[in-house]
């Protein structure tokens, strides 16, 4: 071997070792070694140390300041979402539940449903601020709500109407498959009775009602349920339109059974699907009456006196002249009369 060979070999070995060490350092450990399962589980993204976390398959809430798990029942807000912690610390998930007199829905991940959302294939609406169901009672208290720039029609049990016409603030709308409501055109009419009725929509004060009442009875209207005025409103519209002779034979127009007997005796009933502008619609066991506006996609629009939210049974308010809408096969509709 040449006398200079040994030092050269030593230098080459040192360079090779240095390159191998640098490569291993760049990988974070010995060359080719992978992170262990324990190292992966400890990564912050996999195990949050505050807020809504999951422990042994259950969602819980850890206070960001104290780092302690919440055990006391109550609502918490995290990352803009509302959650409900039950006694013991588990977050309510995947069910409808009640806290006090209010009802809520919690998704599978614990988020409280707010605004418009889908639950078991149906659309619902809960208060965007606190998640409470917006329960509105009977059909006379149904109403519209605005959410993210769109109108939705709220029914009982917080359900949102879909694929049907609705009335919001006395105006006709159609709710699509997502519940979004679009205004319907108010169709022109040549019927004189309907023209008169439309001009009365929204009237609700005692002074307004006096005119519908006194023309027939000749005395003042009393502002209670003891004096329902749906029938006198229908009669007033026919009289104002110059069509009262068509219903004069009904006798006491304020008494709905009289109108029904008139239709029975003279064969004036027509099929609901064939209803026309200005026809008379009778509800229940002769309990209420109104004027037909139009039939649309299996529904019937009406204009009624003593209707709307204020006319709910048991109130002491006179109600209002309101535009309403019903399914043609609604069991609450007795029938349609064409005088």
Q: How would you label these PLM feature ranges?
A:
Residues 5-11, 15-189:
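Extracellular adhesion/carbohydrate-binding repeat motifs centered on closely spaced tryptophans
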Residues 26-45, 167-210, 273, 299, ...:
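Intrinsically disordered, low-complexity
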Residues 185-243:
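N-terminal capping segments
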Residues 204-207, 241-249, 297-301, 309-313:
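Substrate-binding/catalytic groove segments of enzymes
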Residues 241-263, 293-294:
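Short, basic/aromatic beta-hairpin or loop at an interaction surface
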Residues 263-271:
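Short alpha-helix capping/helix-loop boundary micro-motifs
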Residues 269-270, 285-339:
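Aromatic- and glycine-rich peptidoglycan recognition patches
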Residues 276-280:
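Structural motif
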């Amino acid at each position: 071997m040449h006398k200079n060979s040994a030092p050269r070999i030593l230098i080459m070995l040192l360079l090779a070792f240095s390159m191998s060490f640098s490569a291993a350092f760049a990988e974070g450990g010995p060359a080719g070694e992978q992170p262990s399962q324990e190292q992966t589980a400890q990564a912050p993204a996999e195990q949050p140390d505050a807020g809504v976390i999951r422990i042994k398959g259950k969602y819980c809430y850890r206070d960001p300041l104290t780092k302690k798990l919440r055990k006391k029942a109550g609502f918490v807000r995290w990352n803009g979402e509302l959650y409900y912690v039950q006694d013991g610390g588990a977050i309510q998930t995947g069910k409808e539940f009640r806290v006090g007199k209010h009802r809520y829905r919690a998704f599978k991940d614990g988020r409280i449903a707010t605004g418009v959302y889908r639950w078991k294939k149906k659309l619902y609406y809960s208060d965007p601020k606190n998640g409470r169901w917006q329960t509105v009672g009977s059909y006379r208290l149904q109403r519209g709500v605005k959410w993210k720039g769109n109108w939705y029609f709220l029914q009982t049990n917080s359900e949102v109407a879909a694929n049907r016409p609705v009335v919001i603030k006395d105006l006709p709308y159609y709710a699509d498959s997502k519940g979004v409501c679009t205004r319907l055109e108010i169709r022109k009419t040549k019927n004189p009775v309907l023209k008169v009725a439309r001009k009365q929509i929204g009237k609700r004060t005692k002074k307004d009602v006096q005119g519908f009442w006194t023309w027939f009875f000749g005395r003042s209207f009393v502002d209670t349920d003891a004096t329902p005025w749906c029938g006198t409103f229908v009669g007033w519209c026919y009289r104002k339109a110059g069509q009262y002779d068509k219903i004069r034979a009904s006798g006491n127009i304020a008494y709905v059974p009289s109108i029904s007997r008139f239709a029975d005796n003279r064969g004036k009933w027509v099929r609901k699907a064939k209803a026309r502008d200005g026809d008379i619609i009778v509800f229940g066991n002769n309990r209420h009456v109104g004027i037909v506006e139009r039939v649309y996609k299996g529904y019937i629009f009406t204009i009624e006196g003593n209707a709307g939210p204020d006319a709910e049974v048991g109130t002491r308010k006179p109600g209002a002249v309101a535009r309403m809408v019903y399914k043609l096969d609604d069991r609450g509709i007795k029938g349609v009369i064409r005088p």
